[in-house]
């Protein structure tokens, strides 16, 4: 029953977002994507994709569920789903083994499970509006555990690609947890395997608040790529931030703070390969 209610709420948001996007005017995400026929390879331009930009929507394949939203109404997952979907299609060979961390009722797995072998590592505790109980894992394998717990259900060096969407920011921030999570990902990645994580961050007037796992990954893996420069991000006119409309319809009831006080939610993308390979 709870899963059905969540599905209903998601569909309701999709309908309302599309309606508001039409009222506000401008092109939808789907139209922006269709306008650009020659997509930019993400991996070859990973520095450009280090954080969410308005111009990215033209370069990404937009899942149908998000196609009628606009940059003025989209939520973080609309951007993050599109980035991960495009990256996988551009860079991961069909049949590859892929692990999503904290996928819940994963939209990416639903779209691509016929082409790739998917696992979803999720404790199912409802974090970030996710499911709280087991579900029918059609087309993939569900493992109910945490990243960093070294689950025996996930074999060493067995995954070609690991990704997460709005998950890393929910992990505990203590040094031990961060170290264990990175070590577990390294354990799970096959030689030459790679990670791409889309992480929610908060841009304040004087600083960037982001989970410490990103900084640790940058300091310990020479292949890690992202941009955590407050100076660069805060002055980028192309920066895409969570829209005013979306903040007040999705998050205000949780934060109980005005957007100006809370800070601007943005997406940071971090990529790396196993063991510096």
How does the language model describe each region?
Residues 36-91:
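Class I SAM-dependent methyltransferase Rossmann-like catalytic core
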Residues 160-175:
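A short SAM/SAH-binding and catalytic strip from SAM-dependent methyltransferases
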Residues 176-191:
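A short glycine-rich, Lys/Arg-flanked "PGG" loop and its adjoining helix->strand segment in the class I
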Residues 192-200:
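Conserved beta-strand signature within the Rossmann-like core of class I S-adenosyl-L-methionine
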Residues 206-239:
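Conserved Class I S-adenosyl-L-methionine
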